[in-house]
């Protein structure tokens, strides 16, 4: 998991209203080393070493070892962050498959190589600084339940990029031709009916959440966003109101919704994803295994996931959110800045005020 530009944009947007430490996770700071090296122009190799005394098993999603074009590094030029043009995934922390984990013995290293020009426009060329900071989710024993985190901070690597060569790197995310609000090819029959109901559920969730953010219970808002600043409450309500508008029509909107994985990014355990730069949302096969409607608790249903994905879409509300944490336990550990920029905090809040959780 990587902290990146949209997180900083939201923090800057609200300034002193969120003047809290950026990271207050309860997690390990020792035992993990990450080194980035250049493999030529825009190709980068990341080597992760377990310097601890125990074997670790970590979740690959949203890390260097994720085969999908998720954000793996932060790229800066002349002090400015380069926008990320890949995908944001949603997965259910309560249902992670064993194949989504990677194991590292004490002293062992694992490496991954990728091209940063596949998810960022580096065609101007010149000098760039590449780094990565975040955490790995650690599973306990031989299971798949996340029991801890290990923070890391890589070296800062300087790259002198040939812009012409970078421009020739194929984008990891093909551009689709937008024809309709809901893709008619993938959203036929039962999928189309279920998605229509999911949009209705999304509208209901977001509508109640907008009202609760505007003038609802202060303690409940504090629980999910770690502040009761009027400025923050106004911003959260505005995002929910924008989502209500997006969910209210199956024919008009700012996003394109795919009921199937046209890009072939889905893996076991992944439920849905958003491509913010294209305003595209796509469901994975696991999405259709979720219950269409959940009336109690905070577990995801179809409408919950739509709210989550729509918070990522900058065309609906800018800046879009990121994925600092998933599920109630992780999201409760986020500070105010992270909570405001985290997609699942919005879905959880919407579910809580709608279901009385």
From Swiss-Prot:
Disulfide bonds join 187-259, 266-284. Residues 1-19 form the signal peptide. Its EC number is 3.4.24.39. The active site is at 309. Binds 1 zinc ion per subunit. Residues 20-179 form a propeptide. CDD domains: M35_deuterolysin_like (cd11008). Secreted metalloproteinase that allows assimilation of proteinaceous substrates. Shows high activities on basic nuclear substrates such as histone and protamine. Belongs to the peptidase M35 family. This is Neutral protease 2 homolog UREG_02006.
């Amino acid at each position: 998991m990587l902290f990146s530009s949209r997180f900083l944009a939201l923090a800057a947007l609200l300034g002193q209203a969120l003047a809290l430490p950026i990271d207050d996770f309860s997690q390990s700071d020792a035992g993990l080393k990450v080194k980035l090296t250049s493999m030529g122009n825009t190709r980068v190799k990341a080597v992760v070493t377990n310097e601890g005394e125990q074997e670790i098993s970590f979740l690959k999603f949203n890390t260097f070892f994720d085969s999908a074009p998720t954000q793996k590094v932060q790229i800066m030029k002349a002090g400015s962050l380069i926008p990320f043009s890949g995908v944001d995934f949603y997965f259910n922390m309560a249902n992670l498959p064993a194949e989504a984990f990677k194991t590292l013995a004490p002293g062992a290293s694992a490496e991954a190589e990728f091209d940063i020009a596949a998810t960022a426009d580096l065609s101007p060329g010149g000098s760039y600084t590449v780094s990565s900071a975040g955490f790995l989710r650690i599973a306990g024993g031989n299971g798949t339940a996340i029991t801890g985190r290990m923070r890391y901070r890589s070296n800062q690597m300087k790259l002198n990029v040939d812009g012409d060569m970078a421009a020739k790197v194929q984008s990891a995310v093909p551009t689709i031709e937008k024809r309709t609000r809901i893709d008619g090819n993938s959203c036929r029959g039962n999928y189309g009916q279920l998605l229509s109901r999911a949009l209705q559920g999304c509208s209901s969730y977001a509508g109640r959440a907008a009202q609760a953010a505007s003038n609802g219970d202060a303690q409940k808002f504090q629980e999910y966003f770690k502040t009761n600043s009027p400025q923050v409450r106004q911003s959260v309500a505005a995002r929910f109101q924008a989502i209500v508008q997006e969910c209210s029509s199956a024919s008009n909107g700012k996003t394109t919704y795919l009921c199937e994985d046209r890009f072939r990014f889905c893996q076991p355990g992944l439920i849905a994803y958003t491509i913010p730069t294209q305003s595209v949302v796509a469901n994975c096969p696991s999405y259709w295994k979720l219950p269409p409607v959940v009336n109690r608790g905070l577990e995801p249903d179809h409408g919950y996931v739509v709210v989550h994905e729509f918070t990522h879409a900058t065309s609906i509300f800018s800046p879009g959110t990121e994925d600092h944490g998933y599920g109630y336990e992780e999201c409760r550990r986020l500070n105010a800045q992270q909570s405001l920029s985290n997609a699942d905090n919005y879905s959880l809040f919407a579910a809580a005020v709608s279901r009385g959780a």
